[in-house]
Amino acid sequence: MTMMDTDEGKTVMCLLTDPEGTHLGSAMYIPQKAGPLQLTQLVNRFLDNEEMLPYSFYVSDEELLVPVGTYLEKNKVSVEKVLTIVYQQQAVFRIRPVNRCSQTIAGHAEAVLCVSFSPDGKQLASGSGDTTVRLWDLYTETPLFTCKGHKNWVLTVAWSPDGKHLVSGSKSGEICCWNPKKGELEGSPLTGHKKWITGISWEPVHLSSPCRRFVTSSKDGDARIWDITLKKSIICLSGHTLAVTCVKWGGDGIIYTGSQDCTIKMWETTQGKLIRELKGHGHWINSLALSTEYVLRTGAFDHTGRQYPPNEEKQKALERYNKTKGDSPERLVSGSDDFTMFLWEPSVSKQPKKRLTGHQQLVNHVYFSPDGKWIASASFDKSVRLWNGITGQFVTVFRGHVGPVYQVSWSADSRLLLSGSKDSTLKIWEIRTKKLKQDLPGHADEVFAVDWSPDGEKVVSGGKDRVLKLWKG
């Protein structure tokens, strides 16, 4: 780093880059007293933004919250090289941290195994060991419908990204499609899988609107594509030699499946042909996540809550997808029983971009932040780890849970992370300070499932004590 004295005091040679590493102009001298505000003005000027947009700045994955000179002194940075500062556009809205339980809702007769907010954040679905799916009214925080149709535990629920359908999968292998406005079964349960359903993922709305197709993964070793209008399985994706544990339908139209056979397979969706295999894990794959997952889940719905007519929905969803994805390829992260994770750019290479090590026990759940900048991982080693979502570099470890961590979820602005654990608590972690923001005790037993509403207003949790808890800021 070169420093020199000028009329306005000391300056530093800096290079501004976006999170993908694209330079914003060439290296330049900036005053040492410049902090985030001055850098924000500089970036807005360079990008010719019509209005001032908010940015955050990072040096070596640490957020720059002080003037550059103060950072140099504190970190004793060598004065021989250029300082690289990464700029990242912030969400223009802020999510309040939740800090209190607003409602405890009884209703399920057995453990709550899965929970999911609708893409617009207005409705909530839960699945239970009592074989029912329940829909809840978030305004009154009371039960809306009890959906009966399964004969066994409901292991997973998934909303279509246009919010018009809800699909659930059970331990017996059948799939139920529900009309969430009425709580009624749309036709008979769909059969085809021989063993329990491990995951459900919808075709993104920017590829097909209105939503019709979804994919399921099962312990029977297959994944199946279903058409909700035809009410049947249209393609069976066969090739894994053991249980398929997770599935994601990517924004480029490719389906990813993770399996106990230690491989990830990529499928095209017109005929169900295998495109590529991603290998590297030494044990079962438990979880897959995509860098674009939040926009795939929410489709045309954004934080403003605006509703779009069906003919505009596809275009709006595509705009949101392209904005999140940027110029870089969609990224995939996998978490495994071998204690490790891999970061992939599957459209570019079948070799992993990075191996993410550090967990001392199996990795149960992995999840990208809505802006794609971070990856969070939950493990049986009682910790949550945070990684750079672009490079895969380790950032920090969140310790505080005293039991295995089952699931994580992000706030819509990517500033807060939620975790649920066997220790009966939820915890909210702040990404900026890398510290615990809020401890949320209240459940009487293990917390199996958590979700943060896409509009950021509420958190839901469910588990062994059979109740749903809603949390607010």
Swiss-Prot record:
What subcellular locations does the record give? Nucleus, Nucleolus
Q: What does this protein do?
A: Required for female gametophyte development.
Q: What happens when the gene is disrupted?
A: Female semisterility due to strongly delayed development of female gametophyte.
Q: Please describe the organ and tissue distribution of this protein's expression.
A: Constitutively and ubiquitously expressed.
What are the GO BP annotations of this UniProt entry? embryo sac development
Q: Where is this motif: DWD box?
A: 417-432
Pfam family, any one: NLE
Subunit and partners: Associates with the pre-60S ribosomal particle.
InterPro entries assigned to the protein according to its UniProt record, in alphabetical order: G-protein_beta_WD-40_rep, Gprotein_B, NLE, WD40/YVTN_repeat-like_dom_sf, WD40_repeat_CS, WD40_repeat_dom_sf, WD40_rpt
The UniProt similarity line reads: Belongs to the NLE1/RSA4 family.
Q: Which domain of life is it from?
A: Eukaryota
Region (Ubiquitin-like (UBL) domain) location: 9-91
Q: Provide the domain comment.
A: The DWD box is required for interaction with DDB1A.
Location (main, coarse): nucleus
Q: Which GO terms describe its cellular component?
A: Cul4-RING E3 ubiquitin ligase complex; nucleolus
Q: Which UniProt keywords apply?
A: Nucleus, Repeat, WD repeat
Q: Would the keyword Nucleus turn up in this protein's UniProt record? A: yes
The WD repeats are found at 107-146, 149-188, 192-236, 239-277, 313-354, 358-399, 400-439, 442-473
The protein in question is named: Notchless protein homolog
